[in-house]
């Protein structure tokens, strides 16, 4: 067996080395935009101010006017590729130009517009039916006539801002309207106006501010006292969740004409001129604006001298459409831009570090496989685990790779409002050591759910155990999948290879080494994690000219150390919400989760078990502060060096892996990537072993093969392997079918169900009159309450566990009073 394991790990590592070495030989050193060849798309009159968008992969333009406003169009053209077009004559009900175009899933929504005399309120949808363009006018009219307005689609709502109300007399608008597409019969609603005042020809784009998608309004033109138009350089952001505008400053360049979102938090701004005059072959410039650090940098000159009219997404690229109608030639030009992601191989040194890490894990599994004689050794380590190792294992199991990336990402994007959630373990540790551990140790049980049969009945035990097993399989799948996405995006490491390496190695050493291998590998992985994290904090801070002092100054100036508001609002992530959620979540996790409870049972005595809990609790405090400070340091670093940010990574959680891969020295990169592997695998191994334990003890030995102790160890290893393979397969399916959103729903539903488990255990431990009938009613009512709370969003999602806990406890106790069963 040991020789097979060695060969297996060696083969995996050689695949990794060969794949990355070949890939490293053909990579670019910088992220860049590859520009295509400029092409003439169309020749004709009326090319200014057209409605437009992408429909079924083709660019559709309709309406428009000439440079001298003497000709106004009703036609539409459908561009196929860079050459060729289909012309649809007189498709519009009237000549129109300078309206707002928004691409919807089923067509292009055209809003407002004008002709030579007036502005209009009409709204219509351009669709494609049987290969032909069709116009649908069954849409609510605007409250006021508008042209030259800015508009976007956000969360199935259409927003329209500013614009021109009338031509004679000339009048600009500061209006802000929204149309809910799910209830468009309600019509347009008015929202709080932008504090920047009236404007037209502003650019508007949707991008995530680090917390949620927001509406960004930048630039435009406004009327001066001399009755002329002047370019604006200010910007504002509207948060739909808060229904509030915030200023972005007034340092944006003049002449911005288009914008698109890129990556997780970037906005690409296209500038067609640098002043209030139009000059032929004026340089067009691409700017990058980052929504989290609120930094703006000049990226490059666009090899395109004509007036930029629109920038559209098409086939995963952006397509610039412009014209030279102001100079009398009446040609429509196109230019495609492709974002080429930053690519770099890991290199031999980093790969050797990662291989060394996997070799150590394999060695630990082989070593402890020789010490197992029965399932007591396999599941409880024969009581040989020292308290400090059990404490490190508790910490490692709780800290997954998702947490390893998500905590720095959260602090980088927002502040320290969630720091109290992790530190909340200190509040519940006294309850764990004084209530839960004495029950589990005195009963000499192997799984937490054995207690439920002793206290209530076998049905409750089996249901809770099966729910735990299913949850752990799903959890392992996502713990494999999500870090693999980040590593793939940042390093280019193949997702399937990444999932396979982590999954296969975890299955191997967990299957052959049992809980002892899990605990000791967890201990090593925690050392790698914290060592790498401490190095990252020091290295990031030293990268700034002012060192640690500058990091702190930038963080303080931008509110990055804020702990959240003290308002008692349970619908928002206030300080009180976080503290309450932390108490109930940690009480449920550390008191009822088999992967945690199993660690208490591996020590030699109750005193040792209690010390392991306090070790984990005390270790959580500095570790949490370190990981939050990593995020804060990343914010300060990218505030000073915004040019090192990437516009291609779509996931904000990848910011720490991005820094690791692009900025850290050779060798350290391998160590920190091993840290990501370590964070994932410590959770995987713990979940795998605890799920196998629950199956063997609560189902296999209890019902299927009762009294068959001779084959339990073999069955335990088979169960570990099967559960691991199912989880690995689930991760592969998520990668193949791109069903990350399915995990969100899966996790949400099972999380709502498991939220009642903490209340169930406390019901049994703290009351004598609670019985099995009342407990079952408590579980059912708790699930109903949870689903009701989730549907109507009565509380912040952090409080779902608390609502499940409380409802199960009180309903279960009250229901028990109506049933006569033997008191405990």
Please tell me what each predicted stretch does.
Residues 1-9:
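Bacterial N-terminal signal peptides that target proteins for export
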Residues 13, 24-346:
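Kelch-like beta-propeller repeat domains
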Residues 3, 23, 241, 550-557:
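Polar/charged alpha-helical tracts
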Residues 1, 30, 85, 105, ...:
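Intrinsic disorder/low-complexity signal
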Residues 341-824:
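Membrane-embedded helix-loop-helix hairpins and adjacent transmembrane boundary segments
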Residues 8-17:
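Bacterial N-terminal signal peptides
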């Amino acid at each position: 067996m040991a020789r097979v394991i060695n060969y297996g790990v060696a083969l995996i590592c050689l695949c990794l080395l060969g794949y990355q070495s070949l890939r490293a030989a053909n990579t670019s050193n910088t992220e860049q935009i590859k520009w295509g060849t400029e092409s003439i798309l169309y020749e004709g009159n009326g090319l200014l101010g057209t409605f437009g968008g992408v429909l079924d992969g083709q660019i559709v333009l309709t309406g428009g006017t000439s440079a001298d406003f003497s000709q106004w169009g009703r036609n539409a053209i459908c561009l196929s590729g860079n050459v060729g077009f289909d012309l649809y004559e007189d498709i519009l009900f009237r000549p129109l130009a300078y309206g707002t175009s928004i691409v919807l899933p089923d067509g292009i929504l055209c809003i407002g517009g004008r002709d030579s005399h007036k502005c209009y309120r009409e709204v219509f949808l351009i669709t494609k039916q049987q290969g032909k363009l069709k116009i649908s006018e069954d849409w609510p009219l605007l409250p006021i006539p508008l042209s030259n307005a800015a508009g976007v689609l956000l969360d199935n709502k259409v927003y329209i801002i500013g614009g021109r109300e009338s031509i004679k007399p000339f009048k600009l608008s500061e209006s802000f309207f929204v149309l809910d597409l799910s209830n468009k019969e309600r019509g347009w609603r008015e929202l709080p106006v932008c504090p920047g005042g009236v404007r037209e020809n502003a650019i508007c784009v949707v991008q995530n501010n680090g917390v949620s998608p927001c509406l960004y309004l930048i630039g435009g033109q406004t009327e001066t006292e001399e009755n002329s138009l002047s370019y604006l350089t200010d910007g504002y952001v509207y948060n739909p969740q808060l229904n509030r505008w915030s200023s972005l400053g007034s340092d944006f360049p003049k002449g911005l004409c288009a914008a698109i979102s890129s990556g997780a938090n970037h906005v690409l701004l296209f500038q067609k001129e640098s002043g209030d005059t139009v000059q032929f072959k004026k340089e067009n410039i691409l700017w990058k604006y980052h929504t989290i650090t609120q930094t703006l940098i000049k990226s490059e000159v666009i090899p395109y001298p004509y007036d930029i009219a629109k920038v559209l997404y098409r086939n995963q690229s952006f397509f610039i459409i412009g014209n030279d109608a102001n100079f009398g030639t009446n040609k429509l030009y196109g230019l495609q831009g492709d974002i080429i992601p930053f690519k770099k191989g890991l290199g031999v040194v980093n790969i050797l570090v990662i291989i060394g890490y996997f070799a150590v894990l394999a060695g630990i599994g082989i070593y402890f496989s020789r010490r197992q004689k029965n399932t007591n050794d396999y599941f409880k380590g024969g009581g040989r685990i020292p308290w400090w190792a059990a404490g490190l294992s508790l910490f490692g199991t709780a800290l997954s790779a998702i947490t390893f990336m998500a905590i720095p990402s959260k602090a980088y994007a927002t502040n320290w409002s969630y720091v109290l959630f992790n530190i909340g373990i200190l509040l519940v540790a006294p309850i764990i050591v004084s209530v839960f551990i004495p029950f589990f140790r005195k009963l000499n049980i192997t799984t937490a759910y054995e207690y439920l049969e002793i206290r209530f009945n076998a049905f409750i035990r089996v249901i809770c155990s099966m729910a735990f097993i299913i949850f752990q399989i799903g959890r392992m799948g996502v713990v494999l999948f999500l870090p693999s996405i980040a590593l793939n995006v940042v390093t280019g490491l193949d997702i399937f290879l990444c999932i396979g390496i982590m999954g296969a190695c975890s299955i191997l050493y967990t299957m052959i080494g049992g809980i002892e291998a899990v605990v000791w590998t967890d201990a090593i992985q925690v050392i790698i994690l914290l060592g790498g994290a401490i190095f990252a904090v020091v290295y990031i801070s030293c990268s700034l000219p002012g060192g640690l002092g500058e990091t702190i100054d930038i963080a303080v100036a931008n509110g990055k150390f804020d702990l959240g508001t003290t308002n008692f609002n349970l619908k928002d992530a206030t300080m009180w919400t976080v503290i309450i959620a932390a108490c109930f979540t940690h009480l449920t996790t550390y008191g009822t989760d088999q992967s945690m409870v199993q660690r208490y049972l591996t020590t030699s005595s109750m005193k040792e078990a209690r010390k392991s809990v306090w070790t984990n609790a005390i270790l959580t405090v500095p570790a949490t502060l370190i990981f939050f400070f990593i995020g804060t340091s990343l914010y300060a670093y990218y505030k000073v060096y915004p040019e090192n940010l990437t516009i291609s990574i779509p996931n904000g959680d990848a910011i720490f892996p991005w820094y690791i891969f692009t900025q850290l020295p050779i060798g350290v990169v391998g160590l920190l990537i091993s840290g990501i592997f370590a964070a994932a695998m410590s959770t995987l191994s713990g979940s795998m072993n605890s799920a196998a334990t629950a199956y063997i003890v609560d189902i296999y030995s209890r019902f299927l093969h009762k009294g068959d102790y001779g084959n339990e160890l073999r069955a335990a290893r088979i169960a570990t392997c099967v559960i691991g393979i199912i989880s690995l397969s689930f991760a592969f399916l998520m990668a193949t079918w791109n069903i990350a959103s399915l995990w969100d729903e899966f996790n949400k539903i099972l999380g709502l169900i498991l939220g009642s488990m903490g209340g169930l255990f406390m019901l049994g431990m703290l009351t004598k009159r609670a019985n099995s009938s009342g407990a079952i009613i408590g579980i059912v009512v708790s699930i109903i309450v949870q689903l009701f709370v989730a549907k109507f969003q009565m509380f912040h999602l952090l409080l779902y566990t608390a609502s499940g806990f409380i409802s199960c406890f009180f309903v279960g106790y009250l229901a028990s009073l109506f049933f006569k069963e033997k008191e405990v």
